[in-house]
């Protein structure tokens, strides 16, 4: 916002922003784009990828076929990208890079959400320990580096270093050493770009608040229970006072809208204050500083309270636990079947070496949608 109160419509990059003209490059050399920046090209490649389209049929919390209005990984990624762009514009960093990271952050997610990821990781560690485990964050990087097959001259999407690094929210030292330059910050304990920090926090804002919406729609949590959560109770009371005749469904939507706005406004103000305190003059200064993007202490407590409420009351609800048990069995039985007899796999996923075969199986399962995994399981284990 300008001094006269008008909203900034064009984002003039700050000195501490990631500059697309100064990118650290791509894994494979390419001519520069003619009518886009390097980060815009990354964003566009992500949107046009097969992995991005498959997110439409992958779970956020509820299995994909359970309801048309529940969020999927695709709708979640779009919501994260919208919040991330808003934050990037306010802090005068690259909207395109922030958006690209936000859109790509879940490309490596398995079917069935975190339940599928946890079970696939357990299978890899128990049944193929020589191959290493499975982590969706690393898988997202693997998707954009190796697994996408769209271009004649290289595997993957050949994204910029800054986008690839931003996709990695966390990484063990062992994996970081294997990844080379993109994993260096996990070894020298420096920070990612401000764009990556904002995309990460936008993810948190989106899933916490939108899981409240989906939880209420499903009937697994209630308005009465949410009165125990400070940030929800405060905004819901404000909405009830101002709009006493409003139907509960619309009052809830208005409450969630206000909660998201509270988090974005606080995150923006707190991050700008940290930037003023540390005065980074370049993107490299951002890396050497403490985390510059974040919530105030008070709002962080409220966000953590909401997160704990969702964990205790939604993610551990008995109906969710029942579905978790079912989908974990599907993932495990698929993995065991393919590992026991690789001839069951499509030819492109068969490998000579055992550790390579296990990784190819995890790639195959991780790339499945919820519906495809269920159908594949039926084809293998049901008669008819």
Curated annotation (Swiss-Prot):
<dbReference type="InterPro" id="IPR006261">
    <property type="entry name" value="dGTPase"/>
</dbReference>
<dbReference type="Pfam" id="PF01966">
    <property type="entry name" value="HD"/>
</dbReference>
<dbReference type="Pfam" id="PF13286">
    <property type="entry name" value="HD_assoc"/>
</dbReference>
<protein>
    <recommendedName>
        <fullName>Deoxyguanosinetriphosphate triphosphohydrolase-like protein</fullName>
    </recommendedName>
</protein>
<dbReference type="InterPro" id="IPR050135">
    <property type="entry name" value="dGTPase-like"/>
</dbReference>
<dbReference type="GO" id="GO:0008832">
    <property type="term" value="F:dGTPase activity"/>
</dbReference>
<feature type="compositionally biased region" description="Basic and acidic residues">
    <location>
        <begin position="28"/>
        <end position="39"/>
    </location>
</feature>
<dbReference type="InterPro" id="IPR023023">
    <property type="entry name" value="dNTPase_2"/>
</dbReference>
<feature type="domain" description="HD">
    <location>
        <begin position="73"/>
        <end position="208"/>
    </location>
</feature>
<dbReference type="GO" id="GO:0006203">
    <property type="term" value="P:dGTP catabolic process"/>
</dbReference>
<dbReference type="InterPro" id="IPR006674">
    <property type="entry name" value="HD_domain"/>
</dbReference>
<dbReference type="InterPro" id="IPR003607">
    <property type="entry name" value="HD/PDEase_dom"/>
</dbReference>
<feature type="region of interest" description="Disordered">
    <location>
        <begin position="12"/>
        <end position="39"/>
    </location>
</feature>
<keyword id="KW-0378">Hydrolase</keyword>
<dbReference type="InterPro" id="IPR026875">
    <property type="entry name" value="PHydrolase_assoc_dom"/>
</dbReference>
<comment type="similarity">
    <text>Belongs to the dGTPase family. Type 2 subfamily.</text>
</comment>
């Amino acid at each position: 916002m300008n001094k006269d109160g008008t909203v900034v419509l064009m984002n003039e990059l700050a000195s501490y922003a990631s500059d697309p003209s100064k990118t650290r490059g791509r894994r494979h050399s390419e001519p520069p784009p003619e009518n886009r920046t390097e980060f815009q090209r990354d964003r566009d490649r992500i949107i046009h990828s097969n992995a991005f389209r498959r997110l439409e049929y992958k779970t956020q919390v509820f299995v994909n076929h359970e309801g048309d209005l529940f969020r999927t990984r695709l709708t979640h990624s779009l919501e994260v990208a919208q919040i991330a762009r808003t934050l990037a514009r306010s802090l005068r960093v690259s909207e395109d890079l922030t958006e690209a990271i936000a859109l790509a952050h879940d490309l490596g997610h398995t079917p069935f959400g975190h339940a599928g990821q946890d079970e696939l990781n357990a299978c890899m560690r128990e049944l193929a320990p020589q191959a290493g485990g499975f982590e969706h964050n690393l898988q997202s990087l693997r998707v954009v580096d190796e697994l996408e097959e769209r271009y004649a001259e290289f595997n993957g999407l050949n994204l910029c270093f800054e986008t690839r690094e931003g996709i990695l929210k966390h990484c063990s030292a062992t994996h970081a050493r294997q990844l080379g330059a993109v994993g260096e910050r996990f070894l020298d304990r420096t920070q990612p770009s401000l764009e990556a920090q904002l995309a990460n926090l936008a993810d948190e804002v989106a899933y916490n608040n939108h899981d409240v919406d989906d939880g209420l729609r499903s009937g697994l949590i209630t308005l009465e229970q949410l009165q125990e959560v400070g940030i929800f109770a405060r905004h819901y009371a404000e909405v009830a006072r101002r709009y006493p005749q409003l139907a509960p469904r619309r009052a809830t939507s208005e409450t969630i809208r206000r909660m998201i706005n509270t988090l974005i406004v606080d995150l923006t103000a707190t991050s700008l204050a940290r930037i003023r305190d540390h005065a980074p003059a370049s993107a490299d200064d951002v890396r050497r500083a403490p985390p510059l993007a974040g919530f105030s202490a008070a709002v962080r407590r409220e966000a953590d309270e909401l997160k704990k409420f969702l964990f205790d009351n939604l993610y551990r609800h008995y109906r969710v636990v029942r579905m978790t048990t079912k989908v974990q069995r599907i993932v495990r039985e698929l993995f065991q079947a393919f590992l026991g007899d690789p001839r069951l796999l499509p030819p492109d996923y068969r490998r000579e070496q055992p550790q390579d075969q296990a990784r190819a199986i995890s790639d195959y399962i991780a790339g499945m949608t919820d519906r495809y995994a269920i159908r594949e399981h039926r084809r293998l284990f049901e008669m008819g």
